[in-house]
Design a protein with these regions (language model features):
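Hydrophobic faces of well-ordered beta-strands that scaffold small-molecule active sites
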Residues: 3-6, 32-34, 63-67, 90, ...
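Short, solvent-exposed amphipathic alpha-helical segments in soluble enzyme
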Residues: 21-25, 81-84, 211-213, 237
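Short glycine-enriched, charge-decorated loop/helix-capping segments at active-site entrances
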Residues: 49, 105-111
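Alpha/beta enzyme core
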Residues: 24-27, 79-90, 94-99, 104, ...
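Active-site beta-loop-alpha junctions enriched in small/polar residues
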Residues: 8-10, 37-39, 68-70, 95-97, ...
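Glycine-rich, positively charged N-terminal anion/phosphate-binding segment
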Residues: 8-81
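Flexible, glycine- and charge-enriched loops at secondary-structure boundaries
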Residues: 110-114, 177, 262-266
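Alpha/beta catalytic cores of nucleotide-metabolism and tRNA/nucleoside-modifying enzymes
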Residues: 3-4, 9, 130-131, 149-163, ...
């Protein structure tokens, strides 16, 4: 099963992707999806967007740019620009639940207009500008009800999409409630296009359960799980080795204590977060802004490392780089075995 990293706006930019690849990915992430660029008629692309899609910032890893648009002309302009940069695959964002996005009928909001979405896909995928370009969609299963997904899947099935990445939540769920595996199971049975699963794969037991229940899906996309529980990719790789040789040439993988970081895990995490801070300082206009960027990452790390509230509180409340580093030092010094 192929492994993808999900695009998390403001988190999995090129600095994060490159650091993650060095310390964790190591060629085992089949695709890194770039957080969406949003083409518009007047403003052009932001500095962040331009930096994120720059080929020199993505050397050595397989990245797929994501576009958020509901205007076929703007989408095709963005696709042409990405093609010139050397990209051969793009992804359409039909999943972002943000209110400001949805109010403009983009992201998950586009799902509320299935007729317009159908016309959009027809014009985009029949355009000569899409020659030699693959296009996938990352979609939720509706705006308010999973029943909406039956029509949406019928629409997707009419077009030569390279894959459909399904997050089985509706827009009104945001990230609450549980993914609806019944609607996902239905979609897997209906689709003639490769299907990828996205949603709440946080620990190895979540991945194992998915693979056991859906052994024939093409890939799984993981976002928050990789940001906060980076060694999950190592556990997935170990599990794959064990399954490949039926355990005959490999010690049985034991994930009984998968919540516990050992000394090697801690050393790797320390190097990873250290590189992130260094690289953010190198591209941002102040150390304080780089520190705030790191705090976003630590919010996710905190979710997978309970029992260390004192260190996390110091990190969260730090007002300068020295305070931040003291909090980080307390976390690592208190965890190393």
């Amino acid at each position: 099963m192929k492994i993808y990293m999900a695009p998390l706006e403001g988190v999995t930019g090129y600095v994060f992707r490159n650091a993650f690849e060095e310390y964790y990915g190591k060629g085992r992430i089949d695709k890194y999806f770039i957080p969406f660029i949003s083409p518009n008629k007047s403003k052009g692309y932001t500095t962040r967007e331009q930096a994120d899609i720059a080929p020199e910032h993505n050397a050595g890893i397989n990245v797929v740019p994501q576009i958020m648009a509901n205007d076929e002309g703007l989408f095709l302009e963005a696709a042409a620009m990405l093609k010139e940069l050397g990209y051969s695959e793009i992804n359409l964002n039909l999943g972002c639940p943000s209110g400001t996005v949805v109010s403009k009928y983009r992201g998950a909001g586009f799902l509320a207009k299935p007729r317009e979405l159908d016309i959009f896909l027809d014009k985009v995928l029949s355009s000569p500008q899409m020659k030699d370009m693959r296009m996938s969609v990352k979609t939720r299963t509706g705006m308010e009800s999973h029943e909406e997904f039956k029509l949406l899947m019928a629409i997707y099935g009419d077009y030569p999409l390279s894959e459909i990445i399904i997050h089985p939540r509706v827009r009104t769920d945001y990230y609450k409630n549980s993914p609806d595996m019944d609607i996902f199971r239905w979609a897997v049975g209906e689709s003639g296009v490769p299907i990828s699963y996205n949603g709440d794969i946080f620990k190895i037991k979540d991945y194992e359960k998915l693979v056991e229940e859906f052994p024939d899906i093409d890939s799984v996309m993981i976002g928050r799980g990789f940001v906060g529980n980076q060694r999950l990719i190592n556990q997935i790789a170990d599990l794959s080795i064990d399954n490949t040789d039926n355990g005959q040439n490999h010690d049985k993988v034991d994930f009984t204590h998968d919540d516990t970081l050992d000394k090697h895990d801690m050393e790797t995490l320390e190097k990873f977060t250290g590189r992130l801070l260094k690289d953010y300082i190198g591209i941002m206009d102040s150390e304080v802004n780089a520190m705030h960027k790191m705090k976003e990452v630590w919010i996710y790390i905190n979710q997978f490392n309970p029992g260390h509230e004192k260190a996390f509180k110091k990190i969260k409340k730090s007002r300068n780089l020295t305070d931040y580093q003291n909090g980080v030092r307390e976390f690592f010094d208190g965890r190393k075995i």
